[in-house]
């Protein structure tokens, strides 16, 4: 069993910020959107598990982060679509994420990587589309930042802005999650 590699300060900080933003978003959205709160909570656990010392392997942590991506992100988008009356897209996103989570063992490492990035981009684009049509500025920012995180993860470079690429992606994901939490709040205020 290979234990988790040592991490540098930027990696630890990006995980902590993502966990903090996601936990705050989960707590603030639990009353109005349980699906989104569950998605934010999955992101929180995935970020914390990557840092937690213990017997878990790096591969186990990556598998947990992958499941948080393919189930957690569709859960975030589910409520955004559902409240706007787009129930078929909401169900399709969530159902697709569940199928991918179950099929993860059969995809292999490269397949899981592509599937995770595809889910991230699909969720980002669908949030962006709904936000544009409902004039939800936070939703537009959230969708854009989630998309940026997905696109940055596809780059071949190891470092961006003097930081490891994965850290920059986590920062973008944290900013997108914060904006998306605000978008959910704005959306709820519009419908009340």
Swiss-Prot record:
GO terms for cellular component: membrane. The keyword Signal applies. It is found in: Membrane. Residues 1-32 form the signal peptide. It is a multi-pass membrane protein. The chain crosses the membrane at residues 35-55, 63-83, 92-112, 114-134. Keywords: Membrane, Signal, Transmembrane, Transmembrane helix. Its main location: membrane. This is Transmembrane protein 276. It comes from Mus musculus (Mouse).
């Amino acid at each position: 069993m290979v234990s988790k590699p040592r991490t540098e300060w930027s990696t630890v900080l990006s995980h902590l910020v993502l966990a903090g933003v996601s936990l705050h978003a989960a707590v603030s959205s639990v009353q109005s959107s349980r699906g989104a709160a569950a998605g934010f909570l999955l992101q929180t656990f995935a970020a914390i598990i990557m840092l937690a010392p213990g017997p878990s392997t790096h591969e186990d942590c990556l598998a947990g982060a992958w499941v948080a991506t393919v189930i957690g992100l569709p859960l975030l988008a589910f409520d955004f679509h559902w409240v706007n009356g787009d129930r078929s897209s909401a169900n399709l996103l969530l159902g697709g994420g569940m199928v991918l989570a179950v099929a993860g063992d059969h995809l292999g490492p490269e397949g899981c990587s592509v599937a995770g990035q595809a889910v991230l981009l699909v969720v980002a684009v669908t949030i962006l589309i709904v936000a544009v049509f409902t004039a939800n500025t936070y939703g537009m920012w959230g969708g854009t930042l989630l998309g940026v995180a997905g696109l940055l993860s596809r780059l071949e470079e190891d470092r961006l802005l003097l930081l490891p690429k994965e850290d920059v992606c986590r920062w973008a994901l944290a900013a997108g999650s914060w904006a998306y939490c605000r978008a959910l709040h704005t959306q709820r205020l519009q419908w009340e």
